[in-house]
Amino acid sequence: MSEDLIIQTQNLRKLYGPHLALDDANLSLSRGAIGVLGPNGAGKSTLFKCLLGLITTTSGNGTVLGFDIRTQGDMIRSRIGYMPEYDSLDPNLNAIDQVRYSGELLGMNPAQAMQRAHEVLEYVGLRDQRYRKIESFSTGMKQATKLACALVHDPEILICDEPTNGLDQRSRKFMLETLKRTVDDGGGTVLMSSHVMDDVQEVCDRIVMMHKGKIVVQRSIEDLARQIDREIEVVIWGGASKMENTLKELGLSVRRLGRVMRVTIQDENTIGLVIESAAKAGVQVRELREYEPDL
């Protein structure tokens, strides 16, 4: 394995009966913040479980931090923090005991685990709630507790499966800021899945896109953004169909959304052609600006 790569897989496949959950997944990931994006059922959770050695792959090979995912799952899990999508907390425990227990399961002695539990609960914003029972927690507080459990042993890699699922806007913002801080300030590596592109963009600099068990994109977000066409957005009044046709007659690529036209910028003459089209179509231009789409 290359020294720069911490996760590598080759032709990773996972079958559940006749269902192909992972289809020849090939990954080459270095340290940093990586988002795994895809709709529900794309194979994100299955990929994570294979990387952690929690489930056996049907075929293919993979290593995490140099350890074989098929035979050295214990070694991998001792170095990785895992925040699963499913509810993994004991509602009858308070937060401090839940996190301490997670630390002990990962090989920490009780005193060390307790000290670290206090530290990570403060880090995730639950200092004042650490002695409350988890059954009384909101969804956001439960997600924060799961994150604390994943961080308790100071892992080299943090894997978060849909960490913002079910969160309100405030809790979502705090969760994403905490993950970003883990990378930016702590020098950690975060691998997070989501079906929401905005979440990935706030934390990550690289992206893996999955669809039907396949990895279809694996590159930096910056490189991906360069491939998106720049557009001019024009809001008009009257004669939208005529305006659209006039733009196309001039050889421009246009997307129409009601009274809003988004025209691909071809060169420095594009704005002039848009204004010319509006004059020919006899429409009023209410707004004209450069449109910057997100991913």
Tell me what each language-model feature is:
Residues 158-162:
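Catalytic Walker B motif of ABC-type/P-loop ATPase nucleotide-binding domains
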Residues 230-295:
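Short, charged/small-residue-rich alpha-helical element at the C-terminal edge
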Residues 60-71, 75-76:
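Conserved ABC transporter NBD signature motif
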Residues 173-185:
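Helical segment within the ABC ATPase nucleotide-binding domain
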Residues 100, 104, 111-129:
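Conserved ABC ATPase "signature" region
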